[in-house]
């Protein structure tokens, strides 16, 4: 999917303060509190999920690798401690002959934990890929960290195969970094500052948030998914009930429906949500609004646009939230330019 940008914008990425824990998951953000939920990418290639960081020092790249290794060591220590506790429990139960069934159950659990300890160890694999940390079990790598253009790119595979090393090399050969406004010529999937070339047959689900730099209180989450994607992605992915029904002080704000329409590419769709406007004489200057529009889904490629606002004072926001009338025309220009080059 491609689209035109009417003005300067920025993508949400994995922020610098969390990059060392990028394997922990979560999602991309602008700041800790200015964020959507579930910003990342899924790619049906050994069940891959991926993230990209903002620009950071290279030490964060190495720290991210050490975190994966350290987490595995902590888990191994946790298993060893549980084994010690269970062995003490057996010693206590052996004084009572009627507890033989319980003892056998605990012994079985100990055997299972002992088997897990060597499997939990993380090994580093040398696949000949520059500036990379390839991590996994003794024979099967399933974590990939790349250092490219001062960013950390993280790929993790939840269903690696016996030939995962070769599959990782094949994937990285198709991956490349991408500048902010760069549009690749060949087919594939784009994500913030990255691109994976493919033949258009691999299922995907991507949620990436952007915002215009002159109105940072308003973020647009673009959710795209291939037809019949295995994750059964819905337009409301990452949204909560409170996003649709917000709590507010009725003396300060008036709530009303936000009903409009916009084009997603050539398709005219409804844009529905709500708005909270300050009441006259309330002394309040802040406002909030929310909207959702989508096309496709299930049998057709999905494209959804989720719009959320964040009030002045949230992290580094210094201005009040602009009204929909100020922002929606610019969003409409963007959404109308959307083009799905290869609808898989």
For each feature predicted by the language model, list its residue ranges.
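N-terminal ordered "arm"
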Residues: 4-26
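Secondary-structure transition/turn motif
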Residues: 25-27, 157-160, 275
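Signature of long, low-cysteine stretches enriched in small and polar/charged residues
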Residues: 47-146, 211-299
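Long, solvent-exposed N-terminal ectodomains/accessory regions
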Residues: 21-48, 52, 59
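Surface-exposed beta-loop interaction hotspot
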Residues: 165-219, 224-227
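Surface-exposed amphipathic alpha-helical segments
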Residues: 1, 9-10, 153-192, 305-344
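A short, solvent-exposed beta-edge/loop patch
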Residues: 133-160, 175, 289-316
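Ser/Thr- (and often Asn-) enriched beta-sheet segments in non-cytosolic proteins
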Residues: 2-4, 10, 31, 35, ...
